[in-house]
Each structure stands twice: as structure tokens, then as C-alpha cells.
Amino acid sequence: MSQVILDLQLACEDNSGLPEESQFQKWLDAVIPQFQEESEVTIRVVDEAESHELNLTYRGKDKPTNVLSFPFEAPPGIELPLLGDLIICRQVVEQEAKEQQKPLDAHWAHMVIHGSLHLLGYDHIEDEEAEEMESLETEIMLALGYEDPYIAEKE
């Protein structure tokens, strides 16, 4: 049986109202076991200041962002189940859900799924890659009972 070990770090000034650890686990379990047997993922939920700093340092973007993915790269010849880290900014996720008129839990689910696919090597820089990644995201979201996260863009 596939197993995803979650290390959840809540690093917000106010952690109330965040999804439960079991929800984060459910979202990871919907993605990662399709691709590998055993994995360990850290999800760190942060405030805008930490997201902004990391986004500037690692992507050269001077603003906070919804999710950052940091895949773990083991040294050659060493196999470890560590998949990587997801850094999710609470305020950006909440603001985007409001602006896009999406249920908040659906947007949290989408950010975990989106970030997990990045950890697994998927990207959306090229159109063809974006289509494949968005298709997988939609398939997983629908399987979890959520709407297509890209429905507004398709209309």
C-alpha cells in the first residue's frame, strides 16, 4: 500500500481556521500514491512575509505567492522517500478564493494538488506541459468531489 507521510508546519501568526491535518493528508493521498509508493512531504503554511521572502529569494518575484514547491534531490546513489516541501501562503490562498469565488477548502485542495504535482516533476511553463498538468489537477479535484479549478478560464 502506498504511504504518504505528512510533516505539517503551521507558521502563521494566527493558525485558527486553517484546514485540519487530516484534510492536508487526504489531498496528498489523492495525488502522490499514483506516482510513487512511499513519500514524505512537508507542508508549511506561512504568512505573507515569509512567502514574499522565499518567492523573492528563489524565484526573483517581489511579492507573496500562493504555493512554492521545493523538490528534494537526493545525492546520487542514495534513495530516500523525501519528495520535498510545499510552502503555502494562507493570505494569498484566502484572497484568491474570494476573488475567484471558489470555496476556500477547494482552493486549499487545489494548491496542495498543484504543488504536489510540481514536486513530482510536472510544470506549466510550456503550453503542452500546462495542459497535461491542468488536466491531472482537474481529474484529481473532480475525484475528490470538487469542481474543475480551471472552469472560469474555460468559459
Curated annotation (Swiss-Prot):
Cofactor notes = Binds 1 zinc ion.
Q: Which GO terms describe its biological process?
A: rRNA processing
EC number(s) stated in the UniProt entry for this protein? 3.1.-.-
What is an example of a Pfam family matching this protein?
YbeY
Name by which UniProt lists this protein: Endoribonuclease YbeY
Identify a single GO molecular function assigned to this protein.
zinc ion binding
Question: Which compartments does it reside in?
Answer: Cytoplasm
Q: Which HAMAP family match?
A: Endoribonucl_YbeY
Q: Which organism is it from?
A: Enterobacter sp. (strain 638)
Q: Which family does it belong to?
A: Belongs to the endoribonuclease YbeY family.
**GO cellular component terms given for this protein:** cytoplasm
Cofactor(s) recorded in Swiss-Prot or TrEMBL: Zn(2+)
**Organism domain of life:** Bacteria
User: Keyword annotations for this protein?
Assistant: Cytoplasm, Endonuclease, Hydrolase, Metal-binding, Nuclease, Ribosome biogenesis, rRNA processing, Zinc
List residues binding Zn(2+).
Answer: 114, 118, 124
Its job: Single strand-specific metallo-endoribonuclease involved in late-stage 70S ribosome quality control and in maturation of the 3' terminus of the 16S rRNA.
